Amino acid sequence: MSCGDSGIRRILRASKRFRSTKGASKARRDQMNSEIRNLRALLPISPEHRLSYLHSMSITCTYIRKSVELRGVCEESTVFSAVNGCVPQDCALQDCALQECVLQECVLQECVLQECVLQALPGFIVAFTTDGKLLYVSENVHEYLGLSMVDVLQSDSFFDMLDRSDVEAVRSVLADASPSGERWVVCRMLVSKAMRLRSSCCPLLVRIRLRDGVCVSLCRPTADRLPARNADFHTHHSADMRLASASSSVLFHLGFSADELIGRSWYELLHPDDLRHAADRHAAILAAATADAEMLIRVQCKDLSWVWMYTHASATAERDAISCSNYMISEAEAVYLQQRLSSSSSSSSSSSSSSASPQCSSVSDSSDAHSAHTLFCTPPYSPTSSQCSDFLSEGYGSLEALVDSAFCSPPYPPLFPNPCCTPTVCPPDTALDPARLCPPDSALVPAALCPPDAALDPTQLCPPGAALDPTLLCPPGAALDPTQLCLPDGALVPAVFCPPNGALVPARLCPSDAALVPAALGRPDAALVPVCRPLQVCECPLDGAVPLEDLSMFPLPQGGGSRLMPPEASPTTHTHFSYDAAQQAGIGTLAMQIHTLICSFDAYSAARHTHSHHTSCWAPEPLLDEGIIDSILRELDSTHTDAHTLI
């Protein structure tokens, strides 16, 4: 045996003397368990919990963290401060037995008080740091999550209690939380296996308040998951939703006493934007379409403020009375409930439409989707909200439709019988004052000018309808030579030409070589159609005079194929009006008489309507009234009688 082997054996024998034995390991574990039991005894937890060593260590760590974070805050509310207040100063340190008895009594009172407070709370309390480390969880958490306080504290972080999809939303809320304000957020929390069979997550409304770097939150289920016994107040209504009775607690939420509400209609308290939604739910209940209904509405308080309220309404079997459980909610909860109710409406409509025929399913899906989208159209209240939106939606159409029906485009004179007017054909023995047709600044010409080689579509011409009154076209001014408007086979004078859309443009944009062509020569009812050349800006004379060549007959393009004007009836050469001196004098006299009569009526109209902006170029004519007209008629009758007498 070598020396090396003997040395190794000596080392091994020496190490066996210092190696831990089975008894030493057990003694060490017992010592650790004893320390853990001592720590567990200091925890404010009932011995009935029978915590494991691992649970005890995790809760101990949480308790130490809470004591460190709330140092100086908890000293004012500890049991020892209560003991010091209860025990007299002279015996507080002398009689240790008395101090212990008072301590036990205070602990018992605190436990009873804490139990009463937890029972009165609408949820459970969670305290955690801004980075999510848990500091405190109330014992009534098992009523909402199915998990005990000890199980919740094993996670060590508040974010471990949340659903993964809501973690970032809660983090952003905590980052934006002001030190002195409150934040509301709806998030989903993980539940026990038994509750998970009913729903994967439990949506809770978390009301967070930040104080001294500690977030204290009150977590309670959303209003749609609360039982009826936990409603803020109950109301009973008749079939027309008049209040028959109300809980006394309505005074704390709306400011009205129960006696003030009895006999009033429920709709008087609702926001105008929520009336339709509430009426639809009300009608569905009365029609026995559903056993109960959920409503998300805004209610006006006595101080004229608006609050969100979730109402669960149900009718009796006879449908003669309706009971409502009302829950006051925050705006954050209202947004969540609005989304949930909208999604449930969409899902129910899609399931009902799936059983219908394929042709009807597409129509019902679109209509149901639209109804689900507009079911909860309740934006945040503004003072400008009124019932005008409901008024328009009841059958009067949208606001744009009312505006379109009230204001046409383009505007037309008030006496126009139709937006599109037709040319007027004068008899051969009458003439129209040309000065009424072509004023220097406001003449009416076709808005759509066509190229010279384009044929006119018959649909572009105005249908034969109400003729335009010539007096509406322009004010009296700038008379033209009446001989320039006379045609060889009779005076054919157009009143106005309208484009297809009825738009009228000033005469300054009319090309100087545009002329009027008769549609069918020789026909007494032939209408005039415009034949326009390329648009050229021309300057109209200030006196309104139009050169003779501008009113000449312009030949139509050959081969145009117009159905309105046969080729054989179209002029082929430039022809001017040719009348002898006697004819021109007679026509001029007749035109002057007509012009004088028109000016008299214009003056009478201007006296009645002071808003007229046109003034006459001629000297003011005497105003014609009914007396003057009667005297003229009597004079004509007397002249006619004298003529017969002479005969």
UniProtKB/Swiss-Prot annotation:
Residues 16-29 are annotated as: Basic motif. This is Neuronal PAS domain-containing protein 4-like. One of its GO terms (cellular component) is nucleus. Heterodimer; efficient DNA binding requires dimerization with another bHLH protein. Keywords: Activator, Differentiation, DNA-binding, Nucleus, Repeat, Transcription, Transcription regulation. It holds the Pfam family PAS_11. Transcription factor specifically expressed in endothelial and hematopoietic precursor cells that acts as a key regulator of the endothelial differentiation cascade. Acts as an early-response transcription factor that regulates the expression of early regulators of endothelial and haematopoietic differentiation, such as etv2 and tal1. It is found in: Nucleus. One of its GO terms (biological process) is blood vessel development. Residues 16-67 form the bHLH domain. Disruption phenotype: Loss of most endothelial and haematopoietic cells and a significant increase in cardiomyocyte numbers. Embryos show defects in the endothelial and hematopoietic lineages at a very early embryonic stage, characterized by the absence of the endocardium. Early cardiac morphogenesis proceeds normally even in the absence of the endocardium. The myocardial cells form a tube that is demarcated into chambers, beats rhythmically, but exhibits a reduced contractility. Mutant embryos survive for one week of development. SUPFAM superfamilies: HLH, helix-loop-helix DNA-binding domain, PYP-like sensor domain (PAS domain). Residues 30-67 are annotated as: Helix-loop-helix motif. Was named 'cloche', which means 'bell' in French, because of the bell-shaped heart in mutant embryos. Residues 117-181, 238-274 form the PAS domain. It comes from Danio rerio (Zebrafish). CDD domains: PAS. One of its GO terms (molecular function) is protein dimerization activity. The lineage of its organism: Eukaryota, Metazoa, Chordata, Craniata, Vertebrata.
